[in-house]
């Protein structure tokens, strides 16, 4: 998007990568939403930025956080969520909403036991990134993640999914704190993008049903998988992104 004339700020989430903060490798429905709002704080004070023409873009889990940020931050005028996950939903209910009450209770029990162990040890246990080697019965979307995160295609030494993953206990708040509770009150423009063959497509489709008003759009990319929208230039609709931002950041 920078090559198309936009002033772009890319950031590592709080407590990860080149961003500061302790403890490291924490995920949070609140903090990771605030990451976008903090980016808007910074941009709005830059001389070269028109504070009334700020948009955001989130990918995968941060697509959901971007949508949540749009619900809370009225300074955001246009939001793109690409191949999004609702991390609170998938954590609390499992993939395709298959987790029942007993399974959710067991998850809470395990995570709270881990909290005690972490406190005793003085360190946070990591959940692990993408499995390597893959089990033979791994679902196709997990194989796709492996192809991205565990190969030169997407591997980075600071990528949590490529390495040790997030803190295990980071999952706890996502179980109890749904991030998209007020997405129906978003008044700014929203573009949801998802691959036709993505296992996660239902997140965008359901989010779109909740959004109100005429300035909301769901774009399904024919034949694309979830990770195609990470880095595949043949699948990522750059022309549409440019058109969307130019229309709503006038």
Name these PLM-found stretches.
Residues 222-250:
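Catalytic active-site module of serine/aspartate enzymes centered on a nucleophile-bearing elbow/loop
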Residues 67-150:
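Alpha/beta-hydrolase-fold enzymes
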Residues 47-61:
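Alpha/beta-hydrolase fold nucleophile elbow
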Residues 211-227:
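Catalytic histidine neighborhood in serine/cysteine hydrolases
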Residues 1-20:
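Conserved alpha/beta-hydrolase
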Residues 43, 63-74, 207:
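Short glycine-enriched nucleophile-adjacent loop
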Residues 26-47:
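Alpha/beta-hydrolase active-site loop
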Residues 186, 192-194:
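Short beta-strand/loop motif that positions the catalytic acidic residue
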């Amino acid at each position: 998007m920078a090559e198309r004339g936009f002033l772009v700020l890319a950031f590592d989430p709080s407590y990860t990568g080149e961003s500061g903060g302790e403890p490291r490798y924490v995920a949070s429905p609140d903090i990771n939403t605030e990451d976008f709002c903090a980016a808007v704080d910074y941009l709005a004070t830059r001389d070269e930025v028109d504070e009334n023409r700020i948009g955001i873009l989130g990918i995968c889990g941060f697509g959901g956080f971007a949508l949540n940020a749009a619900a809370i931050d009225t300074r955001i005028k246009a939001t793109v969520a690409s191949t999004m996950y609702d991390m609170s939903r998938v954590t609390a209910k499992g993939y395709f909403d298959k987790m029942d009450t007993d399974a959710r209770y067991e998850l809470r029990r395990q995570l709270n036991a881990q909290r005690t162990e972490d406190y005793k040890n003085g360190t946070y246990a990591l959940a692990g990134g993408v499995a390597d080697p893959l089990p033979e019965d791994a679902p196709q979307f997990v194989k796709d993640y492996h192809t991205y995160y565990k190969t030169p295609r997407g591997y980075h030494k600071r990528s949590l999914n490529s390495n040790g993953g997030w803190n295990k206990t980071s999952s706890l708040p996502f179980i109890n704190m749904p991030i998209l509770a007020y997405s129906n009150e978003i008044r700014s423009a929203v573009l949801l993008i998802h691959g036709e063959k993505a296992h996660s497509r239902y997140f965008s489709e359901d989010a779109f049903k909740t959004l109100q008003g005429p300035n909301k759009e769901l774009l399904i990319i024919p034949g694309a998988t979830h990770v195609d929208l990470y880095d595949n230039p043949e699948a990522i609709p750059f022309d549409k992104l440019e058109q969307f931002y130019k229309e709503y950041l006038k």
